[in-house]
């Protein structure tokens, strides 16, 4: 992704091979997509899901990348894109009765977050999107 003059500047962070199932991580990512970075981190701090911790780390890393590499103001950052892909699956065996064995699949995730710097306005991205649809 190249930053052009007309587009808003973006920063990206990726966490690979995170030991959480992609389905559970997607539930958490759906909570914060489109929100400001500050709101997203506050939501994840109190979310009961275990996947909220690695997602919060990736969002914080993307915000730090934007601040340190692109000199962007952290208060203007919004989680523009966030998605979870499936990583490698660790295969384990659980011994069962009479010599059988069941396969256990320990799934991993690749969590990607792209934050975007928006000009400061009175409404958030989520409110503007809802208002335009009505």
From Swiss-Prot:
InterPro entries: Ribosomal_uL22, Ribosomal_uL22_bac/chlpt-type, Ribosomal_uL22_bac/org-type, Ribosomal_uL22_CS, Ribosomal_uL22_sf. Keywords: Ribonucleoprotein, Ribosomal protein, RNA-binding, rRNA-binding. SUPFAM superfamilies: Ribosomal protein L22 (SSF54843). CDD domains: Ribosomal_L22. It comes from the Bacteria. PROSITE patterns: RIBOSOMAL_L22. Disulfide bonds: none annotated. GO terms for molecular function: rRNA binding; structural constituent of ribosome. GO terms for biological process: translation. One of its GO terms (cellular component) is cytosolic large ribosomal subunit. Belongs to the universal ribosomal protein uL22 family. Part of the 50S ribosomal subunit. PANTHER family: CHLOROPLAST 50S RIBOSOMAL PROTEIN L22-RELATED, LARGE RIBOSOMAL SUBUNIT PROTEIN UL22M. This protein binds specifically to 23S rRNA; its binding is stimulated by other ribosomal proteins, e.g. L4, L17, and L20. It is important during the early stages of 50S assembly. It makes multiple contacts with different domains of the 23S rRNA in the assembled 50S subunit and ribosome. The globular domain of the protein is located near the polypeptide exit tunnel on the outside of the subunit, while an extended beta-hairpin is found that lines the wall of the exit tunnel in the center of the 70S ribosome. This is Large ribosomal subunit protein uL22. It comes from Rhodococcus erythropolis (strain PR4 / NBRC 100887). The lineage of its organism: Bacteria, Bacillati, Actinomycetota, Actinomycetes, Mycobacteriales. The gene is rplV.
């Amino acid at each position: 992704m190249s930053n052009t003059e007309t587009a808003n500047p973006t920063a990206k962070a990726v966490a690979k091979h995170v030991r959480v199932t992609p389905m559970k991580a997607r539930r958490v990512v759906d909570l914060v997509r489109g929100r400001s970075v500050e709101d997203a981190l506050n939501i994840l701090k109190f979310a009961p899901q275990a996947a909220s911790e690695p997602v919060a780390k990736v969002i914080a890393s993307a915000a730090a990348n934007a601040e340190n590499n692109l000199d962007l103001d952290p208060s203007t950052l919004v989680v523009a894109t966030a998605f979870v892909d499936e990583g490698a699956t660790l295969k384990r065996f659980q011994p069962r009765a009479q010599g059988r064995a069941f396969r256990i699949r320990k799934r991993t995730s690749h969590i990607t977050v792209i934050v975007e710097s928006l000009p400061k306005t009175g409404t958030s991205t989520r409110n503007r999107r809802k208002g335009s649809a009505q």
